[in-house]
Amino acid sequence: MRKSVIAGNWKMHMTCAEAKSYLEEFIPLIKNIRDDRKVVIAPPFTAISTFSKHSDFDYLDISSQNIHWEDEGAFTAEISPKMLIEHGVSYAIVGHSEPRKYFSESDEQINKRAVFAQCSGLTPIVCVGETLEQRERGEADRVITRQVEQGLENTDPSNLIVAYEPIWAIGTGKTCEAKDANNICSLIRKLIGFDDVIIQYGGSVKPNNIDEIMSMSDIDGVLVGGASLDPNSFARIANYQ
């Protein structure tokens, strides 16, 4: 049985002091979380050490928001797996639509990050998703297929999470219909060819829609943005029914 992974991506939010206060409020709210799920938070790099000092790793894991494909070198503004592992990080988000958009990350670069994350002992959370224009032109399946085939080449599906995040639903308040999201997640599972791969949905996930999203057969978790910044909202998402 696939374990549910409920992940929060804080993006460029929260200082170390704010992260500490958040954890003090959040951890008691998830202490009785069910054994069939895992909670992961991806704080800014500066707050990762706060997590490693103050979080309880039995039910809360740390993710980075990106990762480089080398352990060291002249790569300004990048961060390596060994730097992250030293602080208790066990997951790494790669291929999020924001680096794809703002820094022109290619599927080839995303693949290098994902492969090296696995080689270093981390579990990559690889994001895929189509734009509104691509969706309206009926190209969603083709775009997702390309991103999966190129971005996941030579990865180990037994140590992998794929997050389907329709770009038009991220931070907009618009949520992909649960059945439509499930159909894309089913496509991703078939493309990977491994039934036990964990597939998340991301895009305006909130307490008022989490139960419907998680009732879908091919959705194994969520990657949450804005709603993960509020400890009560994120706890409700983590404790979905």
Curated annotation (Swiss-Prot):
Any one Gene Ontology BP term: glyceraldehyde-3-phosphate biosynthetic process
Family assignment from sequence similarity: Belongs to the triosephosphate isomerase family.
Highest taxon listed in the record's lineage: Bacteria
Keywords of this entry: Cytoplasm, Gluconeogenesis, Glycolysis, Isomerase
Organism field: Prochlorococcus marinus (strain MIT 9312)
The protein, known as: Triosephosphate isomerase
Pfam family, one: TIM
Reaction equations catalysed: D-glyceraldehyde 3-phosphate = dihydroxyacetone phosphate
E.C. number(s) listed in UniProt: 5.3.1.1
